Each structure stands twice: as C-alpha cells, then as structure tokens.
C-alpha cells in the first residue's frame, strides 16, 4: 500500500510523475479546479465582507471521492499543483474539499516535470502560501462581480449571450480604438526615389535611396515636385561623397516568456495563441520520448520571468562550448532585470535539458510539437550565446546637388545567429554586400532612376500577437489570462479574425460603446493595470484582498444602477444573405449557435427553416465547377468540399487555389508556405507565398 499521495492537476502529469517515484507513492489528478463560485448565483456576499461561497464543481464529486479514499490511507499527502497563483488556489481548494485540515499535508511545486525536479521538490515541502491564494481569490471575485453584474445589463439592453469582463472589456476597447484610428486615417501622398547604380568591378548594381539636397533631408509630396527633382538630376555625374565605416553588434535575445512565446509562435509558425498554449502544455506535462519514456521537455509555460536556474545555465554553457566552441559563449552582458510585472520565482520557458536536441527527438513528437519545441530550444540556446558582430558601411553619393545613400554590412562573427533568427529579423530586407571596398575614386554610373508614389498607411490592425504585446506593455492581465481573454472575445463574436488580423464586429462596437459610456473605469487601461498591481501587492502580502474588492465595488454598483435606468435598448440587425428560404422565399439571415454560424429564415416562428452556413472560399470545384466551401469534421478538423455535396464528392484537406497545375492540369492547394499540386505523384511546387487562412 502506498504511504504517500501526490495530487496533481492533470492525468497527463500523473503518467509522467508516476515513473519518477517508487511504489510508496500514489499519484492522482484533480482534473483542474474542484471548487468554484456557483453558476446560478453571484456567490459573493457583497452586502457583507465579500466572502466567496464556493461549491463543488458539477462532475467533480466522483473524483473527490476517489481522492478522499486514497487520502485516508496515506501517511502524508503532497499537493503538487502548478507553480503559480492558480495552482496555489487549487491546492487550497483541495485541502478544504478533501477535509485535510489537521492532517499531514504539504505543498510542493516544481518548474519542470523531470525526475530531478520532482524528487527535489519532495525534499522541500512547505505550507500553502495564502498570499498567493488570496491574490487568486481577489482576481476571481473581481472578475465574477464585473461579469455577473454587467452581463445581465447587456442581455437586457442588447441581446442575450453577451458578456463583459474586467480584462476582456479593456482588450475589446483597445481593438476598437485601433479600428477608430484606421477609419479616421487620412492618407497623405509622398514620393521616394531610388537610383540603381553600377559600381565598377561589381556584377550587380546597388540601389541607393534619395536622402536630400546638400546637407538637408527632403520630402517629396507630389508628382510635380518629383518631376522637378528628376529634371535636375538627369545627366549629372554620380560620385562618392562620403564613406562612413563602423561596427554594430546584435545582442542575443532573451529566453521566452509566455507573451513572447505567443508572439513569436504566431509570427514564425502561424500558430493562434490558443494553439501555442495547448501544444506548450503537452510539452510541459510530458511526451513519450523514444528510449527515455514520458518526460516533460519544457519548463512551466505561464511565466513573465526571463530568469534561468543555475543548473540550466551551467548545462547550456557546457552544451554551447562543446557544440559551437568557447567563443560562442555569452559574456553575460545585457542581462535583463526583472520587470515590475513578474510574478513569484518563475523561470523563463526553456527546454528542461538543452542536450535534448530537437532533431534527435523529432520522431517522438507530432509536427506541431516539434516545431514549437524547436523554437523554444533555439531561442534558449541563442539566449546563452555571444552577440553577433557586423562591420557596417554607410555610403553617401552625390548626383548633382542631390545626395543618395545606401548601407552595407558584413558579418564578422555570427554569435547567437548561428542558432536562431527571430521571425521579424528574418523578414528584414537584406543589405547589399560589395565584393570590393568602395573608395572616393570608385567609378559609378547611374543606370536608372526609379520614382515611386506612396501614400501613408493607417496603423495596422491588431493581430493576436500584437494584441498580447500591447496588453503586456500596458500591464493588463498576466501570462495565464492572455489566451483566454482573446478566446473569449472571439467566441462572443465581438471580433473576427481574417488572415491573422482582428476586426471589430457590429456587436463588438455596440458592447464597447456601452462599456465606455456606462463603465468608463472598467475599460480604462490605466485603472486595469493598477488593479493588476494591487493583485501583485496581495500576492506579496502587502494588501488585504478584501480591501481591494471593498474599494472597487461601490462605484461599480452606482454605475450599474445608473445604466439600468438611463441606457436605451439597442437593436442589432441580423446579417442578410443572398440565400433564399426554399419554404417562404425570404432572404436567409446569419445566426449564431453553440457550434458557430448557421442560416435561418427571418420569418421565425412562422417559418422555422434553417441550414448550415457554408463559407465559400472563392474557388470553383475542380470536378463540377460549383463553389468550394470550408467545412469541418465532427471533431472540428477543417476540410474543403463542393457545395453540391453529396451530388459532387470533391473533398480536399488542403485549401484549393484558383490556378491549375501547369505540369499535370490538376488542382493546386496551399501546402505549408507554398502552393503545390494536390497530386503528390506530380510533385509540382510554386515559389508563390499564399495568403494564409487561420
């Protein structure tokens, strides 16, 4: 019989941890939270001391019964939930739900699920940290009060199914504000002028950009101005005016935090934030590695720290020295100090063992697991390496009275770039490299002048990655909240996502307008950031959590009372389509159900006709010529089929494109970041970069 009971959150961890501990240990899972506030009522004593009234979550009774049974047999119980505020709160709820007060119960935590980390945690058991628990309770109570009090108001004034939230409403406002900026933007004309210049001894011409006239930088805002410049330049000699040499170095990147991993995975791998977190959770909880068994291969994924343990630091130093040489080791310069937002004593996201090289375990991972692990491994490895060094040359050319310039760079030492290049850096325009050094006597000839008209561009739409970056910079939310916040406003259809960009819907605009008018404090980014700081203060034991809630609630109650009396009802019109109801002839409208969009007759309840909403992708069926539509399997996997199914049985897992294969005449699909023939035996691939759909 097992002497010790270890309780973790997920069954996946059970499998991993069990093999690390002997037969004296029983490892069981709580399957996440076991207690929460009730769904049917507020569950908070707002007229008293704001004490939450927790109940057992439906469906968790059987799990708790099994845990109680094992707990009675055990000499000692270890609560081994995640190493953050949420995990601390789950341990506290387990303590009470299992009635373990007064028994031999300890809290243990580990930042990685490896044999050493788990065994080491058992040597350092501790009590539950009530400051961390209270910080989580404060967040839960504040979020419940905002959601439970404001959401019914939205139901009454707009439509049922809407919700407001302390963080989600701020995120929505940020997206709406950007949309307003874009709509209000007035483009302004400007012109650029490039000169392709032949350099004696070089095979390819270089491109220099117009800088100015004499010592003054100039801006050209019309065709007339550009024509004047061109007339003054034509026929003039091109001479080297000035050559300025220098050196620059690029510092190694910091290892990933939750937000930087989400941003980089979005840019480099095209992963939505939710997918990044799902795959990272798998890598953290444990994957079956050939020859090693089940093991966690990355550290804890919810962190805003860039700290690295001494053990991992030493392991990285040894690996880099052996793999690349001592000159590639970091000198330790530029180490970032902790941000004011950093929680607890977490580490950065890194591989649990740098010697577990991605290519060597590729066969044990799914494609997505491998790509994300490789990204994390490369970033961490690079973060412990030396900076890269470049020799730079900036050249100014005179053509008559006008000055053109270009810059070149030559790699002196690749440093960390040997291991990793960030997605943004990979997209940067490559600078020209000259075989022979330029001198002021070099012979130059202007081959062509290339004027180009431009218009200033509005701010870019937010993407999931850029929204996470903004939320973090503003101090809104924490690592555990970024993904669910974005998922919520997408699920509520306040925003939509098209080719990565986030767009506000009509209903999103209405909800944001109501929140700004009636609850300006809730959607104020500075207020929300300050609230996060107060929650941090609770976690540090500096502020009582109930004081935070007590100071927040009265103003919210007054705002709700005022809105209930003064807000007028808003009507949201359904989007009308060109599809005709076969039963009554009306134009069908788009409705939303638990499984997404569907088409319905606006004549309800007199006419109850409905049909699935089929999203046309703008491509004709290769078999019958009718529209190809996006569909989903019962398990949610996307595929593409003919709108005339079952009469036409065309089906493709890859997204078809309009062009035909020039080699075999078959249809082409998007395959990774290329366009390729759907027939693998043909094997034709183009160099075109497709517009990716999410």
Predicted feature locations:
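Core structural elements
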Residues: 139-149, 167, 197-199, 248-260, ...
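Conserved short loop/turn motifs at secondary-structure junctions
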Residues: 82-83, 159-163, 245-254, 266-269, ...
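C-terminal or mid-to-C-terminal helical accessory/interaction module adjacent to the motor/catalytic core
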Residues: 113-195, 246
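Basic, low-complexity terminal or inter-domain segments flanking catalytic cores
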Residues: 2-5, 16, 25, 151, ...
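Metal- or metallocofactor-binding catalytic centers and their adjacent structured scaffolds
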Residues: 215-254, 442
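Alpha-helical scaffold elements adjacent to nucleotide-binding pockets in ATP/GTP-utilizing enzyme cores
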Residues: 16-20, 66, 89-97, 117-121, ...
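Short acidic, hydrophobic short linear motifs in intrinsically disordered regions
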Residues: 243, 251-265, 292-301, 458-470
């Amino acid at each position: 019989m097992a002497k010790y009971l270890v309780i973790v959150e997920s069954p996946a961890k059970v499998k991993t941890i069990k093999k690390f501990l002997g037969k004296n240990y029983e490892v069981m899972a709580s399957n996440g939270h076991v207690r929460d506030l009730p769904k049917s009522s507020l569950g908070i004593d707002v007229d008293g001391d704001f004490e939450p009234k927790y109940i057992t979550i439906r469906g968790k009774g059987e799990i708790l019964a099994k845990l109680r049974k094992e707990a009675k047999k055990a000499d000692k119980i270890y609560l081994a939930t995640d190493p953050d505020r949420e995990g601390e709160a789950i341990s506290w709820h387990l303590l009470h739900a299992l009635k373990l007060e007064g028994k031999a119960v300890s809290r243990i935590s580990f930042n990685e699920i490896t044999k050493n980390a788990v065994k080491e945690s058992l040597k350092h058991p501790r009590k539950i940290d009530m400051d961390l628990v209270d910080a989580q309770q404060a967040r839960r109570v504040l979020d419940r009060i905002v959601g439970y009090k404001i959401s019914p108001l939205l139901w009454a004034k707009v439509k049922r199914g809407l919700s407001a939230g302390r963080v989600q409403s701020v995120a929505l406002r940020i997206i709406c504000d950007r949309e307003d900026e874009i709509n209000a933007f007035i483009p302004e004309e400007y012109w650029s002028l490039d000169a392709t210049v032949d350099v004696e001894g070089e095979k390819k011409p270089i491109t220099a950009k117009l800088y100015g006239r004499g010592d003054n930088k100039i801006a050209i805002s019309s065709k007339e101005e550009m024509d004047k410049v061109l007339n003054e330049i034509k026929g003039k000699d091109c001479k080297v005016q000035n050559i300025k040499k220098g050196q620059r170095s690029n510092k190694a990147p910091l290892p990933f935090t939750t937000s930087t991993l989400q941003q980089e995975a979005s840019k480099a791998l095209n992963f939505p934030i939710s997918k990044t977190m799902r795959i990272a959770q798998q890598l953290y909880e444990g994957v079956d590695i050939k020859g090693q068994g089940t093991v966690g291969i990355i550290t804890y994924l919810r962190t805003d720290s860039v700290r690295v343990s001494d053990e991992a630091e030493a392991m990285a130093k040894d690996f880099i020295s052996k793999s690349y040489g001592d000159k590639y080791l970091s000198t330790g310069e530029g180490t970032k100090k902790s941000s004011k937002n950093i929680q607890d004593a977490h580490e950065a996201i890194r591989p649990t063992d740098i010697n577990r090289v991605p290519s060597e375990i590729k066969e044990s991972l799914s494609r997505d697991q491998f790509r994300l692990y490789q990204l994390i491994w490369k970033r961490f490895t690079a973060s412990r390496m030396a900076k890269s060094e470049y020799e730079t040359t900036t050249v100014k050319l005179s053509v008559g009275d006008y000055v053109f310039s270009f810059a070149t760079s030559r790699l002196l030492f690749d440093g960390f770039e040997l291991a990793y290049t960030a997605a943004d850096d990979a997209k940067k325009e490559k600078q020209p490299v000259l075989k022979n050094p330029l001198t002021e006597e070099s012979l130059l000839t202007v081959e062509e002048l290339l004027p180009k008209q431009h218009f200033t561009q509005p701010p870019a739409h937010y993407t999931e990655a850029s929204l996470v970056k903004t939320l973090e910079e503003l101090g809104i939310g924490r690592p555990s909240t970024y993904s669910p916040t974005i998922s919520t406003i997408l699920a509520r259809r306040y925003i939509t996502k098209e080719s990565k960009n986030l767009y506000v819907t009509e209903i999103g605009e209405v909800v944001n307008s109501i929140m700004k008018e009636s609850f300006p404090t809730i959607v104020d980014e500075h207020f929300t950031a300050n609230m996060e700081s107060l929650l941090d203060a609770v976690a540090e034991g500096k502020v009582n959590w109930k004081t935070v809630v007590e100071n927040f609630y009265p103003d919210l109650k007054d705002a709700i009372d005022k809105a209930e009396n003064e807000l007028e009802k808003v009507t949201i019109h359904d989007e009308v389509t060109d599809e005709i109801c076969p039963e009554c002839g009306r134009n069908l409208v788009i409705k939303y159900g638990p499984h997404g969009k569907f088409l319905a007759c606006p004549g309800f309840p007199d006419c109850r006709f409905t049909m699935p909403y089929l999203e046309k992708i703008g491509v004709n069926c290769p078999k019958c010529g009718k529209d190809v539509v996006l569909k989903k399997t019962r398990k949610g996997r996307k595929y593409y089929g003919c709108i005339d199914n079952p009469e036409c049985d065309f089906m493709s897992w890859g997204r078809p494109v309009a062009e035909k294969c020039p080699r075999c005449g078959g249809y082409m699909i998007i395959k990774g970041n290329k366009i390729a023939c759907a027939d693998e035996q043909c094997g034709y691939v183009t160099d075109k970069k497709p517009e990716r759909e999410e």
